[in-house]
Amino acid sequence: MLRRLVMAAACLLLSVQLGAADEKTKGKLSIWLGYPETLDAFKLGQAEFKKKYPNVDVEILTFELREFEAKLAVSVPAGSGPDILALHDFIFPRYHEGGSLADMPADLAQVVNTKTIIDTPFRDIVTRDGKPWGLPWWSGRNGLFYNIDHLQAAGLSGPPKSYAEVWQYAEKLTQKNAAGEVTRAGISLRLTGPSGGTQKFGYFYYQLAGVQMFEPGKKPGTVQVTIAKNIDAAARVLLDHVEHLHGPKKSDDWALKHDAQGFASGAASMFMRESWVIPFVRKNGPDIKFGVVPVPREKSFGAFNAVEVLSVNKDSKLKDAAWDFIRILQDQAIVNNVLESSGWVPLRRDRDYSAVLSKEPRFAQMTSPPADQVQYIEAPNVAYEEMTTRVGEVIQAGFRDASLVGNLEGAKRVMMRAHDTAVKILKDNGNYSD
């Protein structure tokens, strides 16, 4: 009861801060989104915003993510672009280092700096020299998704609990035809799209190594490459992929439908992805009975987080109104909409998500992660796209090399190429950290 009273007080405080209607402020507030699935939340915010700013028009445009990033990269440095910058964590440094972000109001900075509201890992990615430059809004937190009917048919009583069990389950869940071709993947692996492939390979790597392949460096925006120091773990992850793509343990194939589409169609029994999969499968695979658990542990127990940050363009002519819109987006009804409609996990720890969880309890794995699970975030840096793409190309070429089956030394050589590729790119961009 006390928690709910505190949350109600916080929502009341938000309303007080917005104050009476402002009829003097006029103009157009522009918002661009690279995640169209959050549009409904912004429209809810727009309706509330108009009560405070009746003479400000709000324009919300949505784009495919890469198009969104490209448009921002051209417009913002030129002094234009949207008023509100909805920045993914890996592009946030580009706009901070480019001097494109407006100062945060003190009340929102206090929100970011209060651990009971925004957890420390998420505060840190937006903070430079003790000063936050954006509000972490939602996270894409990963988990292991599994088909309940497939597990039961294979005589498996529940989802895997360890890294080793993931691969053992994959072998038991795989179906093959008379010619030995995989017709249903035991686990759908990320085999294409090198940048995303690097990220998904990292889900496995973290549990074995206890660190990411690319950790934040000593200075914000710099990166340490950890592969060489954890070469045994890196090679083991590569070998496990290769041995489940070739030979008797084969549990996946490039010819199959992959990722969320494969899982929602029943073409895969397990896969690892972020929280948006829950509403996606509900919509696209309504007959699929599925569960989700944290990524199974090994040496370590961590969860990847992809974070969306809300900042204001320093060249905006409506900065105060833009920050008020961001305040409105913290409202309970709006963060509930983000979770329920898009599957992204709001980062406000002082909000009550029980209304959504009562309808979709699988979200609880994301909103209330285990106490001993480490929440980690990719090291944001301006060379992110190039680095993860080139490293992913090395790793995914390794996936196709059947000569690596049982070849630990060969796997180590591949992963050292990945290490050296990342180091060179980071040094060339001035982002490398020892």
Where are these regions (language model features)?
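Glycine-centered hinge/linker elements that transmit conformational signals in sensory
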Residues: 169-171, 217-252, 295
